[in-house]
Amino acid sequence: MENTTILTVKDLVNEGIAVTGASSLFSSAASHSSSESTSTNPKSHPGAVDSDFSRKFLTPLNYPTVIFGTVALPSETLKCPNRYCFRFTDGDLTICCDILGFEFRAIGSKICVLSWNFLPMNHSGGFLEIINWKFVDSGSLLSRCSGISSFPLIPSLYSSQNGDRKSRYSVCGVLESISPVSVVPCMDGVSSDSVNLPGFLVHVMACECKVYSRDAIDCGHAFERSVFVYFCGLEAASWHPVVMKLVGRNVALSGLKRKLVYVRGDSLLVFVTTENSVLHPPWLSKKGTVSKTVVDRRGNCGSYRGYVRGLYLKGKLVEMDEDVWLLLTDQILNRSHSIRTGSLIFIRNVHFVNTKFPWGEVLILGACFKTSITVEFFSPFETSCLVDSCRQTSLSLYVESLSFPARLWTLLVRISFEKFNRMPSDKEILRSCQKDELTKMYAESRIPPSMFQPRGGIFTEFCMHESCGCNSEARDCNLKLVMPISSFVHHVKVMLNELLSQIKKDFSASDCLSHSSSTWKRYNNTNPKTLRSEDTGVILLGRLKISSSGRLQLHDRTSSIDVLTPDLLSDRNASRICEVPDYYLIIEGIPESMLHMPFLKNPFRCSSVLNPTPLAIKNTLTVPFSLSLGTASCKHLLKHHPFDWRHDFNEFKEGFFHLFRVTHKFPILKNGHPGMPDCTSVFIEALVLPWDLICTVTEEEAAAPNFEEHDTSQEIRPHKRCKTNNGLQSQSFLSVPHEISCQMTIRCASSHCLVATATLSNLTENKSGKMHSAMRVLLEFIPECSNYYGLQIGGCYLMKHGSDDSFCVGRSGISNNDKINFRPETRLWSLEFSFDEVLTHDGSMDVHPLVSSQPSFAVEQQNVSSRQPCSDVSLLLPYDAKGLFSVFLNDLEGLNKPLAAGKDNNNISCCTQSETIMHAEPSRLLPSNSLFPEGNLATFRGDVVAVDAVTSSVVDVSSSYCINVLVNHQMVKIFGPLRRHSYLTGFGFGTNATFYRILGTGEQNSFVLTSASFIKINSRKALDSPPLEKPTHGAALCLPKITPQEFVPCILAGPACNSFSGNEDNQQIKFACKVLSVYLLVLQTRSDDPSENECRNNIDIPLAGFVVDDGSSTYLCWTSGERAFTILRLHEELPEETIDVVQWTRRYSNWGTTAYHLDQIVRVHKRIVMKCNGSQIDVLFQDITIAVTSDQLLTKSEDKFLKWLILNAISGPIWEVAASSMDMKMIEHLEREQCVEMETSRYNLQSVWGNEVCQVDPLVRAWSLLQGLLNS
């Protein structure tokens, strides 16, 4: 130790960094740690703490160091929140410490610390973990004790000189357990004042021998008698960390006195320490090791050894091994600073509670007053020390009164609230409901009374442990896991990645990842997988918001998820946290091989909320998720807080409101062209009614609502008889009363309702005195405005009048066709009308419930009773006013409501909604030479059967989709650029949707989406299987051919051909051919929108030209999309014999398809144009030019792969092509569309457009030729 540096405590504290040091950099001294015989838990291993690479190891000093000092008992001079931990002092400064290999002789002796960890702390400067140490001077070992085998609990300076005759009892045995230090009120012997004395209890399994002596040790001891010893007083309580080290070992105490105490009415004999008490260190018998019981298996208690993976909520929740959690919730527990992430701890007398939650099974280690924890190895990581909180909150008191499963659940809820940046913005709520209070309020509303556990004092629970109910924990718990959205989304991604990894191990890549083109041909949501909330056992927490793309999302601080058409009450608030207990999770676009596999093989875990698992697989599937929920599925957490619902009712005090009805919504459209921004405003067409609602809600009514939502059935709902104008019935229709009294029912999401009186006042012109007519206006919103999403076509709404209100009819000069800018902060309420005594919707044409409370996600099953619709405000009007309001409420049916299906009773009912499915009479127009579709606007509702990425004569080349909708057993086709409708979350097969204002094409059952068309998703079938493919030829390896039985917008399916083919002579021909060359190839990314990136590759081929030969003639065949995919053979697996290519692709992934690896290149360069200047490909590829739009150059491997792609197409099979001829106008159109020079004039080749492509099966072709000969 000549070159060893001596550090002082002051040096470490002043430096203020976490470091570790040792006396030797090459070898470590022998440790004094005890040779504990208990084995480590099989699940625990040192590598468990190294799995998280984000943890940082303690910084080691690069030179040998030692520290000299003295280990002392706790004292009041060192203010430590943990109160009872060892002290280490070098004479100048004192800090907290813990020591491995503890020996009695170390107390008060000077030691040399050979290896150590130091962690800075705010309260006392720092904490020293002593790993290896040795005595400095063995001659001073007897300075404190009279003998090597005895240590007086109180120094001789304070102890009585005369021995007390009552202090003659002794106890020897095995120390089973130790309680925390607590305070007991006692009477002062000098005065009559009450003083609080600290102390702690120990439980010893003692021997029946009368007197303890060293000479009697060698006789056999039988430790069979249960004895309790109370260490009383400040000096005795300071021995708590020493006695904690002795749990499970032999000890002896002498100089005790006996006291008879009463616990729950029963007497109990307890030994109490005195001023003369002496503690004798552990000993070993000369006849062998004394048998001892380290693991107590009586009841549900035992011992557990494991590594600490994480500490949460200031050490109340400790993560041990997988699905093993230690609860340290009792405020009085004395915990060591050294219980840190990465340390190995040994827990004794802990409750084992195997609990089965709805989301999975968890082993809970419940600590009680008998639990003791010792650290066997210190953590090597730079993690924070465990510091007890001196403040006892109402949440901590509440948690202590619960059973262990309920404690764990409550702590997880508390951690979930950490995912939110801020609590509710209302100042009153912010003051009264912080995160602890919010957790307590939420837990009280969810935890049943059976999970509350009455608590006794520390004496009761320690001495009468078996009778305190600690061993009667329920094994089944119905509390669902509460998760924020970020944790939920992350876990679903991990779950999918693990499932994909398993598939790749079990099957070959070609079986599960190489899909034929028919698998990929659908638009979005081809293969949906649905998980119910009952399957996951998870309740979601989040805030509602409208994203910039127009989607409604549930979000928290770090993540979000799309929400599928929820019908929410208008009192939603973006700043309030919502609870979603009932929902459907829709996972879309996954491979068919994954659909029938168990998605919940790895259930949700507590660690999913606390410490999400990092994604194990990169470059994997990108699948969109969405939630489907309804009114009853989204509630505010503060719904029981009085301020929450009173604030809603206060809005209706002494104010008047405008009434309007939504007639149409214009969709949020993405531009669809790179470099051009999306729309900055969205619009809603509305009809402003010439009535104002005047409310008279009083303070008393707002403070005390009449009833709650569960009491709102028609039988028990309270009624107030409305004032009915007796002369109203006799008046003519043109004689409109100035005011109509009505009854108003106000509802909010907090389940509270309020019934009050109100008045409808009509708006009359000043000069004539006649009533105003309804005004049709255009409401302008920003896309992020939540009001846009909440407004439903056909719904009536209330808006409160304001000082700068431009919505007033007759007051601010509003007129027809005015555009009104809607402010985002404007509050709206949905409104429904009912007449006479009917308050709920009974199916009448005159009652208009405008916001449905039923779930948006409808599962097809029989005998499902749908809940009645519900709105924010209901107006009960006199029956005489029914005819008056029908003018305003029913005059829009001809414009926006679809025509009924006559008397045909074969209406399908694939969802639980009570709305009747309608169909529109398509316009029957004569053929026209116009390039644009001609027809009437229609509105209808039906079931989406399929969405095909095909081309049409009425839409552009690259973004056309055909929506097949089943309406009254008739197939209706709708064409249009569906991807531009950014709000269509969850749209696809199995969706029931209503299509508003779509344009007829003049052909039967054929329609087109326009920029004014709006699609509303009503419900979604819960299907876990892919859609049934239409019957196709078994030999086809490409898209199924479009047969006459299917929808064909016109005879020609090619985009360019049909745009200019205005005659019937341009028929398509079929021929078998071989690819000679790839003349032109345009590759680009399909979309920048992540929702478009389904399980297919994100490559778009807007144009491709192939030189083909049918044996007699050579053609220049142009095509796009999936037909080009098929000819290029992108869906086939890469051949293994292509050595260079395979080596290149393995650097990216081991996925087998050509399309996947091409996607890697296109994703980088955005757009690639390949052009061949010759009619055939030369061997050296000298006539091929490749242009990219990105700033990066093609790498050598990328250039080689693209040229190999052309060779792969040339070496392909014989194709059967159905094509139509092209003229120069069509070619020029394609050149302008794709901004390329096709230069077809220099080749004397006929240009054709390939409409259908499929591989020729020789047997099928021979059979068809034979059939043709036979038929001829």
UniProtKB/Swiss-Prot annotation:
Pfam families: CTC1_2. One of its GO terms (biological process) is telomere maintenance. Keywords: Chromosome, DNA-binding, Nucleus, Telomere. GO terms for molecular function: DNA binding. It comes from the Eukaryota. It is found in: Nucleus; Chromosome, Telomere. InterPro entries: CTC1-like, CTC1_plant. GO terms for cellular component: chromosome, telomeric region; nucleus. Disruption phenotype: Severe telomere deprotection accompanied by a rapid onset of developmental defects and sterility. The large majority of plants have grossly distorted floral phyllotaxy with an irregular branching pattern and fasciated (thick and broad) main and lateral stems and siliques. Although most mutants produce an influorescence bolt, this structure is highly variable in size, ranging from very short to wild-type. Flowers and siliques are often fused, and seed yield is typically reduced to 10% of wild-type. The germination efficiency of the few seeds that could be recovered was extremely low. Component of the CST complex, composed of CTC1, TEN1 and STN1. Interacts with POT1A. Belongs to the CTC1 family. Component of the CST complex, a complex that binds to single-stranded DNA and is required to protect telomeres from DNA degradation. The CST complex binds single-stranded DNA with high affinity in a sequence-independent manner, while isolated subunits bind DNA with low affinity by themselves. Associates with enzymatically active telomerase. PANTHER family: CST COMPLEX SUBUNIT CTC1 (PTHR14865:SF2). This is CST complex subunit CTC1. It comes from Arabidopsis thaliana. The lineage of its organism: Eukaryota, Viridiplantae, Streptophyta, Embryophyta, Tracheophyta.
